[in-house]
């Protein structure tokens, strides 16, 4: 496997020289890694790929630190024993313990409460934990990958993130650049996402006209790769590239006729697939005469 090719979708080889070698070294050494970058730049995918290359037999366990209420965060992360507090009627492991032998991925760690950061630091340093309400120590064999959208340097200076935890996590930081800083990747990625979406939806691959290319390269892509994937799927379906509310030159050039033609073609292709190219069954589902269906198949080059 060519590791540089495998990681090209998510990381910038110019910012991280010999990226494949770096990624492989990370996975084999099992060191803690910090991924930084805006939303949609591929942090989740990168974390999972590092785990997959590591050869670790345990699970890849993702935890979104921003999605768990602060009142539940400690028990969710460290686990709990029965009777530790009112409502804890059974013992259960937390995210950290569930990653035993594998990789714990702490997504949006910049959202973790300060009190929990101190306890996480102790786990990272000792590679051991006690479940909430227990004095029994559980020794850990885990790799930890954390990601942050905001700058942790700024969060430390603002008192929102512990300096010692930052230094502990910052053994190696991989910065994933936003798509707007890599304009040369927009068209190749979009073309590939369009092909993948067309295959998924079982429809023909639509053209990417020069005007559409201008729209793609002129957009800022605040949602980065995630937004680009969504735009590719909308294009395959014949919908406005940048969402229903956007008024771009692409919409005016393609017009309603183009959009309706693309939607009609997709509907006919999907009906034919469901009925194994049986014209009678497809025309019945689409509620159009057989003669009309034959004509539209020819006109739409299906």
UniProtKB/Swiss-Prot annotation:
Residues 9-237 form the Sigma-54 factor interaction domain. It comes from the Bacteria. Keywords: Activator, ATP-binding, DNA-binding, Hypersensitive response elicitation, Nucleotide-binding, Transcription, Transcription regulation, Two-component regulatory system. Residues 279-298 bind DNA. InterPro entries: AAA+_ATPase, Homeodomain-like_sf, HTH_Fis, P-loop_NTPase, Sigma_54_int, Sigma_54_int_dom_ATP-bd_2, Sigma_54_int_dom_CS. The lineage of its organism: Bacteria, Pseudomonadati, Pseudomonadota, Gammaproteobacteria, Pseudomonadales. SMART domains: AAA. Regulates the activation of the sigma factor HrpL which itself induces the expression of hprD as well as other hrp loci which are involved in plant pathogenicity, hrmA and avr genes. Probably interacts with sigma-54. This is Pathogenicity locus probable regulatory protein HrpS. One of its GO terms (molecular function) is ATP hydrolysis activity. GO terms for biological process: phosphorelay signal transduction system; regulation of DNA-templated transcription; symbiont-mediated perturbation of host programmed cell death. ATP binds at residues 37-44, 99-108.
């Amino acid at each position: 496997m060519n590791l540089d090719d495998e990681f090209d979708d998510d990381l910038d080889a110019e910012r991280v020289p010999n990226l494949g070698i770096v990624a492989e070294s990370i996975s084999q050494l099992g060191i803690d890694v910090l991924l930084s970058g805006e939303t949609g730049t591929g942090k989740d995918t990168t974390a999972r790929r590092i785990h997959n290359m590591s050869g670790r037999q345990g699970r890849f366990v993702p935890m979104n630190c921003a999605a768990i209420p602060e009142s539940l965060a400690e028990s969710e992360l460290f686990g709990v024993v029965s009777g530790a507090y009112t409502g804890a009627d059974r013992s259960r492991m937390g995210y950290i313990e569930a990653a035993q032998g594998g990789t714990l991925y702490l997504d949006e760690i910049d959202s973790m409460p300060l009190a929990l950061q101190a306890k996480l630091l102790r786990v990272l340093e000792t590679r051991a934990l006690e479940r909430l309400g227990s004095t029994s120590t559980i020794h850990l064999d885990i790799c930890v990958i954390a990601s942050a959208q905001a700058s942790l340097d700024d969060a430390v200076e603002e008192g929102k993130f512990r300096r010692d935890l930052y230094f502990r996590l910052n053994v190696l930081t991989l910065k994933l650049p936003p798509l707007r800083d890599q304009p040369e990747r927009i068209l190749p990625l979009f073309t590939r996402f369009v092909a993948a979406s067309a295959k998924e939806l079982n429809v023909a691959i639509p053209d990417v006209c020069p005007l559409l290319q201008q729209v793609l390269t002129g957009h800022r892509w605040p949602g980065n790769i995630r937004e680009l994937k969504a735009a590719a799927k909308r294009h395959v379906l014949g919908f406005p590239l940048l969402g229903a509310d956007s008024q771009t030159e692409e919409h005016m050039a393609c017009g309603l006729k183009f959009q309706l033609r693309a939607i009609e073609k997709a509907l006919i292709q999907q009906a034919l697939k469901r009925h194994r190219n049986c014209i009678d069954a497809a025309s019945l589902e689409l509620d159009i005469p057989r003669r009309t269906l034959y004509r539209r198949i020819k006109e739409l080059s299906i």
